[in-house]
Amino acid sequence: TSEIANKNAHLLIRISDLHPATNEINLNFICPDWSLNRNPEFLYTLFVPDRASTTFPCFDQPDLKAQFKLQLKIPQAWKSVANRSVEKEEILDSIKTLNFKLTKPLPTYLFAFSAGKFDTISRTKNGKTCVLYHREKEEELHNNTDSIFSLLFHSIEWIEKYTGIPYPFEKYDLVAVPSFQYNGMEHPGATLYRASSLFLDAKPTQQQLLKRANLIAHETAHMWFGDMVTMPWFDEVWLKEVFANFIADKVVTPIFPEFNFDLQFLLAHYDIAYSVDRTSGANAIGQKLANMKDAGSLYGSIIYHKAPIVMRMLEQKTGESALQKGLQQYLSQNAYGNAGWQELIGILNTAQTDDLPRWSASWVQEAGRPHLKTTVDEKNMVIEQLDPFEKNRLWPQELDLAFSENGKITRQNIALNSIKEELKNVFSGGNPEWIYLNSKGKVYGFVELDSTSVHYFLNHFSSLTDDLLRASVLTDLTENLYENKLNTTEYL
């Protein structure tokens, strides 16, 4: 037994205390409260991204996974939940001692436990039992419990089928935390949710129902994408989020057939991503992170809104089946380990004729967005891609050209893989009423509209009966306003 010095948040172990071969170090310490989130009647841990080391000695690096064995001593009347189930329980003098099973390999930010005056409800389906820890009133439970478990089991089953990998952890328990800081946090076996995000009013709107379903699907997707396979370093925190968003959208689509999900996606992501990407201070999806202390600075609109757009582009480029197979290989090859975006691109690139690494470098490592414009010469058209920062960069993508001649709309898909694309004999007469490169709302960039198209859209906007086309046109008209290609008087 010896004293260990504590300096600059590091424990200094003397060389003289170490011996050749294997060493085992046991530490006795008192946990600070910084990340224990204590309340009078409950507490919960929240270690993301680098706070585990404020509670116990460890290296907060996602590529250093460990197996955790936890013992808790809590008041007898309290309940507790952690990553694994309890293997031994003892009660002495009104103190409950709980010993939890050894976890799968986890990064420190996913190690978790909660304890307090919780009630529990459980449901079992196909041999899998899930438990909901909550502090809600009976009326709130009556209106929501069945829906919560139905969404949870649907999410698990759908993702198991999509990935070809059974649920990768022992259990899935939910903890509904009053006034939780986030909507959810994907601790395997003890996933935290903001209580108000799960327990809706008696007459929720369809949007509220969709939001809850998407949240449960998102956190469930993390069990495979982020928990089982984790990014090597937090500079790729965007990766676990984009995977979870991508999968969640697929999970909820069959539940809400009345929704236009392409329209929902456009409205949810493009305006917010553009609000950053049109500025001189835009940042790339992939960013450098020198120190884990700065990991929180990486979160923002580009991670949560541009990255999903790029992920959707990747599926469009590879095809749904090829991407699914690539993700299955990505997960199976790196189970309970670490892998990043480049590993996925490497897997997908072996089956692609296109240069995916080049495509990825443009969209993930570069900040900003392309500027797209058209020029018409009688029956011919030229599409140019300009770099707003004048670096001569290229962002390859699929364009959804549409134009109207004599009231007839023609559509054409165009793969833009160069700075300039010349199209011959596109038009029959050379005088289209309007030309639009983004008719399906999937093109990313500043789509400059020619004056004829602007005039038509502003004067015939209500005649555009396709909801997606109308929303896309409005988005791009707004961007033309921001880029000084359209004056305020015209726009209003």
Kindly give the residue locations of the regions a language model identified:
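Long, ordered, helix-rich scaffold segments
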Residues: 270, 301, 391-394, 406-412, ...
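Preference for bulky hydrophobic residues occupying beta-strand positions
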Residues: 13, 27-29, 72, 132, ...
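Short alpha-helical segments and helix-capping/turn motifs at coil-helix boundaries
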Residues: 10-12, 53-58, 66, 161, ...
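Short, glycine- and charge-enriched coil/turn segments that flank and shape catalytic ligand pockets
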Residues: 19, 88-96, 126, 140, ...
